[in-house]
Amino acid sequence: MLNSVPLVIAQHSTQDDTSLLNSIGNKWGFPVVSHSEKPAEGFYLQIQNGVLGLADASEKKVLPVEVDFASPASLYRKQHGGGRKEPIVKAIGLKGNEGWHVVDATPGLGRDAFVLVSVGCKVTMIERSPIVAALLEDGIRRLALSFPELAAKMSLQHGNSAEVMQYFTGENVNAIYLDPMFPHKKKSALVKKEMRLFQQLLGHDPDADALLPPALKLATHRVVVKRPNSADVLAGEKPSMAIESKKHRFDVYLCQKP
């Protein structure tokens, strides 16, 4: 897993963008370089119009990957109640439990976390990659500018998810959501550009099975694992039930705590 990439100052960067870029570099330990020092290959971070994005120097025609919780698509889905129809909402068991605290231990770009927040949950995201964590944090920052009530329900912890869950000290966790990165076929048209980039950057999760035991111990009600329909169950552990969608399966593990 790649832990650091350069932060590139855009050629026509504004003072606000440069200030934000330096702040991110100081917090996460990313080296800040000028536009003339932009790498010819590999990944780098940049800020354009106040948005942090991850770019691949070898893919000049591909737009940087960013976390945008306030995108038109996300907000349309929230405003029209689409989130309540999502399989993840059914799997988490939110009917009548909209105020639950959910830990998303594999947040990726945070799309599933935002679905849960949009239906009333409080979500804690745990991310081990400082690069992805920086993108998520920037997404929360920008969401707070327009929708502070939603941003207030999202928090981020940087660290190894299995370890953070094992020693979790926050408020009670009602449910935990796991969506380990699964190796896709190279020619699969279903893998979107950002997921291809993430897989190149982070690889699949070799320790995915290690996430289930601490999750089952921490959650008070259930653990939900998202898997491709063709994938085996996580850690060889048979779920209590499964909810299937067209492309994925949500394995649900009910937790019975004394």
UniProtKB/Swiss-Prot annotation:
Reactions the enzyme catalyzes: guanosine(1516) in 16S rRNA + S-adenosyl-L-methionine = N(2)-methylguanosine(1516) in 16S rRNA + S-adenosyl-L-homocysteine + H(+)
Molecular function GO labels: rRNA (guanine-N2-)-methyltransferase activity
A Pfam family this chain is assigned to: SAM_MT
Residue positions binding S-adenosyl-L-methionine: R111, D112, E127, R128, D179
InterPro entries: 16SrRNA_methylTrfase_J (IPR007536), SAM-dependent_MTases_sf (IPR029063)
Enzyme Commission number: 2.1.1.242
Principal place of residence: cytoplasm
Gene3D superfamilies (UniProt xref): Vaccinia Virus protein VP39
GO annotation, cellular component aspect: cytoplasm
Keywords: Cytoplasm, Methyltransferase, rRNA processing, S-adenosyl-L-methionine, Transferase
Function: Specifically methylates the guanosine in position 1516 of 16S rRNA.
Family from the record: Belongs to the methyltransferase superfamily. RsmJ family.
Protein name as catalogued: Ribosomal RNA small subunit methyltransferase J
Native organism: Alteromonas mediterranea (strain DSM 17117 / CIP 110805 / LMG 28347 / Deep ecotype)
Gene from which this protein is expressed: rsmJ
